Structure formats: structure tokens, C-alpha cells
């Protein structure tokens, strides 16, 4: 049997060689058929040149001028091609969320709760514009959640080193987003310290000796709008007393439109410590919510003591006046704050404006501070029968009026110097 197998093996080997040779020749013929001849030479010696089709002309190497024009027409493609190289050279890496990954949900639970936010010292920023403003101001990022890599590449690469980068589905970001149209990127930052922040030079150049003190502001939308107005007017600082909504709440950040990263914001202050944050010789002015006609209807005693005219305070004064008649006791402990129209001059010295909430008004401590610094109540007159102005609107009116007065004083001073 072995003798039969051995000859068969030697017979099969030549057959394989023949098949391989035939297959190689067949492939060569097929490849030759695919080619189009350039010149045909017949046995008679006649030569026929084949003409190329108009659409199959050989490509010409682009000239240097045309290449430059092409680059100018496609700047986005060129910049996009450079971005990955910068990203790769930086050595940044990101993780991709796996099914059932709870990192996003656990972090969102912390940053959306004020007690956890203050305990952990972290805030949530959403959107490329707000995140870019925070990075430029020197805020410290801790973690980014994004749905597309292009969103992350728009941020400064040097600011992303050492930061946890996690790619998640857009649906997951949409579930936790407070925006109507989520932008596909969320950033977790350490709570900014105003001492370590670097604010824009243009903001510092237009800064005025004008401060804002927020007293019992509970509405996030109002506070965010007020901060935006303060940044636009050129306030040098904003102080928030205890009882105000957290300045770093997501709704306040969204309404502020980046104002948090243009000026110092000092949060959660006791009234005893507020004077420590005021420049020397600062006068404190309190915004009054009542109009001239409502002011005239108040009792002389309430008007003299400078209370904001809401029903709660007027009832309190009525009770106090009746008690004075019975006991004959004096109420010298109440602050005496004069009333002044908001458009009269009140910026001859550094000024701080106190804005109270719409529900509770300004506090007794704010009036005491205004009395001790020689400040006044700034009255914004309204038409009889119209309710008090919105806190954000009143703050905008007073702050931009203060800016107008300060600019006018600066122009008068420069004019006097030019004369001399």
C-alpha cells in the first residue's frame, strides 16, 4: 500500500505546478485586457495611435498658485486636519461610557443640589461658550462629559490636561440638561475663588467704583439677570448676603450669560462681614421699591425711618406707633435714612447699591449699614396704581444711572484739566 501512495504523491506535484502556471497566465491576460493600448503596430508595419477620451485626460500637477487658491477656499478642512495632530501631540485620552455607566448620573446629583455642591465644592457648567469663558478666567476643570469629540477640540488643549474626559451618548446629556437645546458638552469645575480668578482686561479697564449688594434675592432668574446687568454696567464687585439663592446654581449661571467670570462674586456673606469687602469711604444706598405717591401716603415716622413700603412693613410700623403712644418709649434704634430720587447725584464717593428681593424687601441690616456710611434711599418713582418694579429691572436702572453719573463726572474732570 505504501508503494502505491509514494508514486501518487510524485504524480500530483507536477499537476499542481501546471495549474499554478496556467492560473498565472490567465491573470496576466485579464490584466492585459483591462488596459487600453496607446499605440497599435500591425504586421504590415502600419502604426495607429489611439486617442484618449475627453474625460480621461491625464492629470496635470497643480501649480503652486492654484494650490494656494485651493487652500484659501478650504480653510475649515485645513484647520480640521490640523486639529487631530494637536490633539494627538498633547497626549490626551478620553474614556467611552459603557452600558450602565453611572458616572454622569452620580455627578449630576451632586452638582444640582446646593448642600452637596457646597460640601463637594463643585459646580456644573453647560455649553461651549460658558465653559470657554470659565477656562479663560482661570476656573479649574475636573471632568467633562461630551457627545462628540469636535465639541471638546474647540476648547484650549492646555486647559484639559489632567481632566477626566468621558464620552457619553447625546441622549444621556439631554436627560440631565436644563437647556431647551442641549449643546452636547457639560463640565464639572471646582467652585471658583474670586481671589485666584483672572478676569478679562477689557472688564477691568471699564470697572467703576460701583458695587452691588444683593439682599434676600431668592429667584434664580432675577439674580442671573442682575449679575449680567452688573457686568454690563462695570461693577467692580458683587456681594451676596445669606438668604440669597446660590450664585452658582445652574439656573443663575444660565441667566448670567458668563457674568460670573467677568467680575468678583462673593457669596453667602454675613452682614457683619460686608463692610470688610467695601472700599474705604464707600456709601451704601438702598433701592426703594415704592413710588412718590405711595411714599406720601405713608406715616411720617415710617418715611423718616426709611422702610421700604410693602404691606408687611407698613403693618409693622403701625403696630410700633401704637405701642409708642401707650408706653411712650422711643424708637431710636430704627435707622434714619433719607430719601433721594435715583436721578439725583449720588456718586460723589464710591457707592454700593443694595437690591432687595421682591418678597421680603431689604433687611434691617442693610438700612443700618446705609445709615452708618451716610447713604440714602434711592427712590424710583412709578405711576400710581402700578406695582413695584421687578428687582432685576430696578437694579439695572440704578446701576446704569450710577454709570452715567460717574462717566459724566470723569468727563468734567478731564475737561477742567484741559483748561488748566
UniProtKB/Swiss-Prot annotation:
Keywords: Methyltransferase, Mitochondrion, rRNA processing, S-adenosyl-L-methionine, Transferase, Transit peptide. Its EC number is 2.1.1.-. Residues 1-40 form a transit peptide. Expressed at same level in normal liver and hepatocarcinoma. S-adenosyl-L-methionine binds at residues 356, 380, 389. GO terms for molecular function: identical protein binding; RNA binding; rRNA (guanosine-2'-O-)-methyltransferase activity. Transmembrane segments: none annotated. Residues 49-88 are annotated as: Disordered. InterPro entries: Alpha/beta_knot_MTases, MRM3-like_sub_bind, Ribosomal_eL30-like_sf, rRNA_Methyltransferase, SpoU_MeTrfase, SpoU_subst-bd, tRNA_m1G_MTases_N. One of its GO terms (biological process) is rRNA 2'-O-methylation. It is an enzyme of class 2 (transferase). It catalyses: guanosine(1370) in 16S rRNA + S-adenosyl-L-methionine = 2'-O-methylguanosine(1370) in 16S rRNA + S-adenosyl-L-homocysteine + H(+). Its main location: mitochondrion. Residues 69-80 have a biased composition (Basic and acidic residues). It holds the Pfam family MRM3-like_sub_bind. CDD domains: SpoU-like_RNMTL1 (cd18106). SUPFAM superfamilies: alpha/beta knot, L30e-like. It is found in: Mitochondrion. Gene3D superfamilies: 3.30.1330.30, 3.40.1280.10. GO terms for cellular component: mitochondrial matrix; mitochondrion. Belongs to the class IV-like SAM-binding methyltransferase superfamily. RNA methyltransferase TrmH family. This is rRNA methyltransferase 3, mitochondrial. The gene is MRM3.
